[in-house]
Amino acid sequence: KFTLWNRITAAVVSLIAAVTYLVTIEPTASFWDCGEFIASSYKLEVGHPPGNPVFQLFARLFTMFGDNMHAAVAVNAFSAICSALTIFFLYLTIVFLAKRLLRPSEDGTYSVGKAIAIFGSGAVGALAYTFSDTFWFSAVEGEVYAMSSLITALVFWAMTKWYEQADQPYANRWIVLISFLMGLSIGIHLLNLLAIPALVFMYYYKQRENGHYSLWEYVKIFLVSVVILAVILFGIIPYLPKFAAYVDLFFVNRLGLPFNSGAAFFMAALLAVCFLGMFRTMKQQKVFA
């Protein structure tokens, strides 16, 4: 019954957050980027750099359920729902941490007192964040921070699921999901990339769960996370599109081919390299190659 009550408590906490945010959403637009995000989402136009295409696509989906006079309310409601789901995954993450502190009995079950303490910890932590000023402020307006928070919470929760199942077959599917979500998050807000160091630390902690790390080992783990973050932030994000543009210029100006043919070739070549690498690593059984 622990799992059942855990799910019920998570649902109740997220429902409280959803009702609170939907009741208090902005009726129109707040006086900053929200008006731009609402308009660009409704018309699927280009927002200010670096852009938020994933957010705009989902926000546009919500605006399709009403007329143009209620587009702002629809986008604000989308933020409210994203924030409520953030609270849901935050609760589950806190429960995961509480279970690490309160160990079950020898038969693998929790006593009533420990279960109440675990559920209470998750509920108090999640509801405290629900009604915090900064999060509530962003939860009721058409901004990217609500969806960004959801992806961050979802990624960290997925890492806890991998942590619990790391020794089981196909546990690395959670790593694949995390990689996919981190890729999507680039189209929402770059703030999500700051979750990478925490994920790297969790991965290394699992490799030596009952051991200890020296100070130098902590430094090396931190440096690994910084390198991964830097490669994505300063390498992949700016230079992949730039290189695609150079290839397109070469195809159009030098080879006389139609516009966007170079970009299409670049994307096809990039996908081919990715699939080739995937098949080779599968053949050689190198999981994290």
Segments from the language model and where they lie:
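Membrane-interface transmembrane helices that cradle and orient dolichyl/undecaprenyl
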Residues: Y110-I116, V155-I175, Y203-Y213, V273-M278
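Extracytoplasmic catalytic/substrate-binding loops of multi-pass membrane glycan-assembly enzymes
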Residues: I25-F37, G47-A59, H70-V73
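Transmembrane signal-anchor helices characteristic of membrane glycosylation enzymes that use polyprenol
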Residues: T3-S30, Y129-F131, H189, I232-L233
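Start-transfer (signal-anchor) and selected internal transmembrane alpha helices
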Residues: K1-T20, T109-A123, A269-A289
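Transmembrane-helix motifs of polytopic, lipid-linked glycan transferases
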Residues: A11, A77-Y110, L154-A158
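Aromatic- and kink-enriched transmembrane "portal" helix at the membrane-lumen/periplasm boundary
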Residues: L22-V23, N68-N76, P104-I118, G122-S149, ...
